[in-house]
């Protein structure tokens, strides 16, 4: 049954939206970048790169790693595609499937594997400054969450600005939690963050 639900989720994400030739959430298609951000309790690392075309439709891959002060860990991968849901100049809106593997410190150590969906938006505010606002949301339903967890919820909002050349400063807020079986919810992130992005090409 979970295999059937996995197939349905992927199909809805990739086929339910009208997909266009994709651009990465960076300045131009095909670019690659690495991010490093830190908050009071959480360190986050991310790699953004181009993905192989799917039926002629381009896309990008987003790999992330998160480590908390209490030594909880989450590794994630997203395959994102641009859509024309919101045909607004300077706005990119993407949807795609995501996979998370987490080690939580709730109660006894808990391992979680989740399949879900993500949506992300980026709006370019001032091109000459490299100033953009961004936000994203992720969700994994209970039927696709394995281990001692029910659901995954992940929300991020922030902004970036170019400091020099390929170097950008990032800042924002992230709220990320798992709902657990017979235990209180486990929030991995609920704080502001700041960091840098290095654009590789």
Model-derived regions, located:
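Positively charged n-region of N-terminal signal peptides that target proteins for export
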Residues: 1-4
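Bacterial N-terminal signal peptides
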Residues: 7-16
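Short, flexible coil/linker segments at or flanking structured domains
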Residues: 8, 24, 31-35, 151, ...
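Short glycine/proline- and aromatic-enriched beta-strand/turn motifs that initiate or cap beta-hairpins
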Residues: 18-79, 201
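Transmembrane beta-barrel strands of outer-membrane/channel proteins
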Residues: 34-40, 59-67, 77-79, 95-103, ...
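Outer-membrane beta-barrel transmembrane domain signature
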Residues: 51, 83-92, 100-201
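Short connector loops at helix/strand junctions that flank enzyme active sites
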Residues: 56-60, 74-78, 90-96, 112-116
